[in-house]
Amino acid sequence: MPAASLRALLAHSIDYAGMFPPCNLALEPALQNHAKYIRESDAWMLSNFILPTGQFAAVSGTLAQFDRKHPLRVSALGSKTETVAAFRPAFEEAFEAIRKFSTEHTGVVSIDQFEMLLPGDVDLAILAEAAGMFGEMKLHVFWETPADTAERAIALLAQHNSKKNVRVLGYKLRTGGVTADAFPSAAHVGGALIAAARNRVPIKFTAGLHHPVRQFRDEVKTKMHGFLNVLGAGVLAAEHDWDEGQISRMLEDENADSFSFDETIFAWREWEIATDRIHARRKLITSFGSCSFDEPREDLQP
């Protein structure tokens, strides 16, 4: 059994994105994998199944492997748009698909999350309009922008969240891909984590976090961020009010011995956070999308 502090840091942390690069599975085998994973002993690490809203209709005939005890928990992914003019109808289409799909499969499918790329010209009014459309739906909403605009986007989301009686909006940071240029610098990742912590904006991540600790990988010809680095830096930075230099040092650490977990404490070097505080900080440091559920958990094995 993993140490309590490790369980706190990684509980429901992996959104399974099997249909996306580099795995690129077809819908049916990806769903079969997810149905298997939610019945395994490591299911405590698993969160949602990333599913584009355009694939909802195709899923309807492949739900026999899910039931009320083992529902398909979905993070719905909206389509990519370049401008607000294109974003508004794309979002409305995604919203209608979510409403319809949820109604048709009550008890077997639970749409817990929505993710979508924001166009560069989005403003506060558009965010409020989009957030308001979800009404009473109980789902978490995350908006993605390029990593070099993360801090500005998080500030905009915080401005929205500061208003009374509004849906809290989160930020989605892309942390990698299949080519070297898809990986943001430690400074960009750290800046986003600090901005999210200081503004109390929920943050999730996607891509490039297959391995626990930062390392060079031949398949992408660059260093990949580690999920222990990123999630760990997120909770420690929030707990200790780190600056950009301190958080970059943790994000760039490639020594697995720097990380230690026991029943009461997670530590990175001399910095510590108690297990109960990890639970509290994880309300804002939420999850990461990965096309593999096997790689992250296998790499954690001693």
Label each PLM-derived region with a short phrase.
Residues 63, 88, 128, 155-157, ...:
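General "foldedness" signal
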Residues 1-141, 145, 236-302:
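Alpha/beta catalytic barrel-like cores
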Residues 122-191:
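Domain-core and long-helix interface of multi-subunit machines
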Residues 151, 165, 169-246:
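Catalytic alpha/beta core domains of metabolic enzymes, predominantly
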